[in-house]
Amino acid sequence: MKNISEYLNYPLSKPIGFLLTDIDDTMTTDGQLTSEAYASLFKLQRAGIKVIPITGRPAGWCEMIARFWPVAGVVGENGGFYFHYADKKMHRWFSQSTGVRVDNQKKLEIIQAEVLKQVPGAEISSDQFCRLTDLAIDFCEDVKRLPNSDVKKIVQIFENHQAIAKISSIHVNGWFGTHTKLSTSLTMLKNLFGLTPDEAQQ
């Protein structure tokens, strides 16, 4: 990873209009959002740069982030949805229909039971109660860090059920579907700001 200072004099073909960023261990330091990091969001907003957090964190968190942070929207649960607050109204877009999400939650409950049975020390993430599209298994946030072999075992259990599983810095997140952080970010940029995928990635 390179220090951002290396890019201070990087030539740009046009001004920066958007900043898409992770939250955990990117915006946060030791699990906390510092005053400096939060203040920087307001500075970016004043500079005309639209900030969009892209996170594996749950719908409950994203509701608050979209409503109270100076951001243009937020992509949550690894692309399961995006939320956008404007004109005193929360706008929510989901990668899947309500019926599909309900069916997937039932399948995730089976995976949850299997993980807790087969991987001692693993726990359901403390924020699982406000998730709508995925299952998050805690392997080091609020539990003693599990060995890498156990983390890989959790991933394998998800994959044995044909679910997608991704390892973050604190959780293994699993879901059903083809959505990703990138795909939903591109959908959000198109729906809200009219950017094509090519324009968004320039």
Q: What is each PLM-predicted segment?
A:
Residues L33-D127:
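Active-site phosphate-binding/coordination module
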Residues G17-L19, A72, Q201:
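The start of beta-strands in P-loop NTPase/AAA+ ATPase cores
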